[in-house]
Amino acid sequence: MQRTLNVGVILCESFISNAQNPVNSYIKIYENVRMFEFAIKLLQESRINFQKILLYVLEEQIPLVEKVVAKYENCWVFRSKHNEVEDIYEAKGFIEDKYKIGLKSSKNQASSYYDNCCFVVLEACRPLTSKKVVKNVYEKAMIDGAAVAVLPFERQLVCGDNTKAVRQLKDKGNMNYWRQSSTWELQFPQAYTLNKLNQYHKNLFMKARNMLDLMNISAKNPLSIVDGSAYSFRVVTSLDFEILLGILRNG
């Protein structure tokens, strides 16, 4: 029987480039829109029936994200007041107030915050920042026992000097990823192009969906799944997921 949750929340990190190679705001928006759409498809394809999917976005992302949301049913955009999308407190308060989640059990209300909310956090596989952000989101969400699935969106991105980055792509025979790219995408190889996204989309999507399928949403058996590709984070649960993390880390 399909599990039903009231709200699925997607928190998508803003892209953070290194100081030597700043990326303009348009590329940040472009990347996050691609990630949001990936997450929406992921939730809708999972075995869990989400009555609502809430996208937590920045002010500057709304015009483009709303176009994505219009293509899917039961999706809403929540406007963030802060610059950091991983500020889960704001999203949590909004959800608790709007959907009356986290209140005492009754016939018309949720039995617990955990039973009704799944946080899906997408990150761009940045080893230097991922562990801190994931730990922060995980601990804050688990205050109310929410389920957290942390999914990688892409392989490690090329960063650093633009000339060096493009040369690395050519050396590895990967320049075909960028053949249809516009000039600004070539200047900033961190941005995901449609070609590169499609190259790994199918396998990554199936892997992420399988991770969600393994989630046992139950107040008696709280369980969170964390991808271990860039870090190792111990999950306290009745089921030992260290084996799963090892498989994910080692392919």
UniProtKB/Swiss-Prot annotation:
InterPro entries named in the record: Nucleotide-diphossugar_trans (IPR029044)
Protein name: Uncharacterized protein MG116 homolog
Species this chain originates from: Mycoplasma pneumoniae (strain ATCC 29342 / M129 / Subtype 1) (Mycoplasmoides pneumoniae)
Upper taxonomic lineage: Bacteria, Bacillati, Mycoplasmatota, Mycoplasmoidales, Mycoplasmoidaceae
